[in-house]
Amino acid sequence: MENKRKQKDEIVLVNGSNDTTPNKKQKNELQVVSSGGGREIILGTERTSKLEHPIMQLIGHKGEIYSCKFNSYGTALASGGSDKEIFLWNVYGECINYSVLKGHKGTILELHWSTDSNEIYTACTDKSIGVWDSNKGELIKRIREHSGVVNSCCPARRGPPLVASGSDDRSARIFDTRSKGSTHLFQHKYPVTSVCFSDASDQLITGGIDNVIRVWDIRNQEDPLYTLASHQDTITSTSVSKDGAYLLSNSMDNSCKIWDIRPYAPPNRNIKTFNGAQNNFEKNLIKSSWSIDGRRIGCGSSDRQVYIWDTNTKQLQYCLPGHSGTVNEVTFHPNEPIIASCSSDKTIYLGEIKP
């Protein structure tokens, strides 16, 4: 075929070893990346990050993806879902899928990196919590103390290597990964769908299908310090801001809320509510997250969009299309204006936004 000059808006499709890739990549290219080697390139966007292209689509999972997180350095992304595997991806360059961690026997519902990024923790429907060596790609420990699906897990930011978990068995537990057995047990009347630690790691925050968020002093496993009861449906995620002052929650009532969890805060701790993101009949545990500076929050949605709000003005800054299935998690890069989103459509997007 006679070569023709490529137009600015042309899409170049390259599969495998096909040699039609342009020799010089433009600064403003967008790229779709597959772990199988194929990619598409679209031209025409102003750059704000060190991503190789403004939008990168990561393909390789064989099932729905329910969780994705950047490591603390922002150089790697971990993802997990219904194919029972954890994929590790390079964030920069060609976004290569450099490792696949296998060992779970059920769907991975949530994952987190340790603070030093040397370990990954996973919550799974096989009733276990996995502790993985992210460098060797090996399973270090499988914790089996729950009698039901483990919906959520979260490592402590400070102190000993503690990991919290929440389960359909109506309990939340805390484990020290250096020892056997749980160190703390928090009984609930209903399944626990989300857990997270306070910034100081001296409190555990739990949410469940009774629509209530409970804040526990980990030294007192009998009764919570206080409860946060403003959501009208199941709590699907909880996360604490970087400064430890605020809690972000997401719910099946189609709202995200910010709570003041500082000591001596007024009784009505719900200070802001963000509407727009949806949760439909699938009833997925859709997750929300903070940007590292706390100026933005992001949330997945069953309407296949990525939602990002300004936390000061409550203004919706972005409603981003692209996925063809429910967006189950949105997470922010620790150093750059980059977001990652994972979906039931088996794909992940990395995209840069304005600083």
Swiss-Prot record:
<keyword id="KW-0539">Nucleus</keyword>
<dbReference type="GO" id="GO:0006397">
    <property type="term" value="P:mRNA processing"/>
</dbReference>
<dbReference type="InterPro" id="IPR020472">
    <property type="entry name" value="G-protein_beta_WD-40_rep"/>
</dbReference>
<feature type="repeat" description="WD 3">
    <location>
        <begin position="145"/>
        <end position="185"/>
    </location>
</feature>
<protein>
    <recommendedName>
        <fullName>U5 small nuclear ribonucleoprotein 40 kDa protein</fullName>
    </recommendedName>
</protein>
<dbReference type="InterPro" id="IPR019775">
    <property type="entry name" value="WD40_repeat_CS"/>
</dbReference>
<dbReference type="GO" id="GO:0005634">
    <property type="term" value="C:nucleus"/>
</dbReference>
<keyword id="KW-0677">Repeat</keyword>
<keyword id="KW-0507">mRNA processing</keyword>
<dbReference type="InterPro" id="IPR015943">
    <property type="entry name" value="WD40/YVTN_repeat-like_dom_sf"/>
</dbReference>
<feature type="repeat" description="WD 1">
    <location>
        <begin position="60"/>
        <end position="99"/>
    </location>
</feature>
<dbReference type="InterPro" id="IPR052234">
    <property type="entry name" value="U5_snRNP_Component"/>
</dbReference>
<feature type="repeat" description="WD 7">
    <location>
        <begin position="322"/>
        <end position="355"/>
    </location>
</feature>
<dbReference type="InterPro" id="IPR001680">
    <property type="entry name" value="WD40_rpt"/>
</dbReference>
<dbReference type="GO" id="GO:0008380">
    <property type="term" value="P:RNA splicing"/>
</dbReference>
<comment type="subunit">
    <text>Component of the pre-catalytic and catalytic spliceosome complexes. Component of the postcatalytic spliceosome P complex. Part of the U5 snRNP complex. Component of the U4/U6-U5 tri-snRNP complex.</text>
</comment>
<feature type="repeat" description="WD 2">
    <location>
        <begin position="103"/>
        <end position="142"/>
    </location>
</feature>
<dbReference type="GO" id="GO:0071013">
    <property type="term" value="C:catalytic step 2 spliceosome"/>
</dbReference>
<keyword id="KW-0853">WD repeat</keyword>
<keyword id="KW-0747">Spliceosome</keyword>
<dbReference type="InterPro" id="IPR036322">
    <property type="entry name" value="WD40_repeat_dom_sf"/>
</dbReference>
<feature type="repeat" description="WD 4">
    <location>
        <begin position="187"/>
        <end position="226"/>
    </location>
</feature>
<feature type="repeat" description="WD 6">
    <location>
        <begin position="280"/>
        <end position="319"/>
    </location>
</feature>
<keyword id="KW-0508">mRNA splicing</keyword>
<feature type="repeat" description="WD 5">
    <location>
        <begin position="230"/>
        <end position="269"/>
    </location>
</feature>
<comment type="function">
    <text>Required for pre-mRNA splicing as component of the activated spliceosome. Component of the U5 small nuclear ribonucleoprotein (snRNP) complex and the U4/U6-U5 tri-snRNP complex, building blocks of the spliceosome.</text>
</comment>
<dbReference type="Pfam" id="PF00400">
    <property type="entry name" value="WD40"/>
</dbReference>
